[in-house]
Amino acid sequence: MPFIIYFYIMGHCISIYVMNKSELRSEKINSVLENKTNKKEIKWTELSEGILATTHIPNIREFGKDKTIAKVSTDYFGGNGHQEAKLFVNNKKQYDKSSEFDWSVRPINDVLKSMGIVAKDGQDEFDTVGLGKYRLNSDFK
């Protein structure tokens, strides 16, 4: 148990999909955010700035039609690690980068900027949408 607590404080390891809430049809938004699900629906977590996040999209090819969706992941512990991001527009990959071998690259911020997120004063795009609060996939409920 102490390791888990220590990791939670020192680490950041997520692998999620993010999209703008505006990409969903308006009649679906409330049922999605209230997590009223059947076997085909997706459980979303609402972040700041109109961004939705989920750990799983069962049929990404079908769901991704006519949408902009990013797949982002982090793997950090005690400051060391990397992040990756891919951006898909209508199922076509528009961006695919990792900071694993080039720490000057900030793929998640790049993708969030492409999705219209503007960093607030003193924050980057990652913290502006609130991703810093979610350390593990299990934090997305």
Regions found by a protein language model. Name each.
Residues 2-3, 7-8, 67, 115:
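Residue-level marker of intrinsically disordered, low-complexity segments enriched
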Residues 3-36, 140-141:
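Short, extreme N-terminal segment that most often corresponds to the first beta-strand
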Residues 40-141:
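Charged interaction segments
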